[in-house]
Amino acid sequence: MVLPAAPTRFRSRDTEYRYRPDSELFYLTGVTEPEAVAGLVVGEEPRFTLFVRPRDPDAEFWAGPRMGVDRALSAFSPDDCHSVKELAQRLASLLDGGDRIFYRTRHGDGVGTFVSAALERARARGPRTGGGPRALVDPGEVLDDMRLIKDEQEIEALRKAVAISIAGQRAGARSLGGGVPERTVEAAV
């Protein structure tokens, strides 16, 4: 399964909207970093490989801190973690073992190009090797039901999130008053 992060949306040339992570990527990994890609392999030896943006002091000065490979390793505990710049060269070997690639093509993120190339290579080698992925499948076939039906741990996490949201909304309401700028209310929330 290949799960790319949601794309960053721009308000104008160099002004971004607040980033909203991809729901499926966040649900399975907790990753909220733009441009991240998770590779999940199931089977006898399940593997979680994560690709994230490398640290870049110049870019971070303007757009905020990046997780980087080292922090992503400790924060998300993947089996492997690499710079997203290595995705093209590493993705094919990651996808070689299965018979299907789960990938949602709705992202205009460039990852689809690498997934398609890996699928084509596997199809070309298939007659010689007898293996490799043969089909592209929407991950919603698996994830939609998983996200819909909650276990006790997920229900407790939702209760906690609701309590935090209520407290934030109340704090925002308490900060309201004449002449209070919107950013003050947002900070209270």
Residue spans for each PLM region:
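Generic, well-ordered alpha-helical scaffold segments in large soluble proteins
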Residues: 161, 168-171, 175, 188
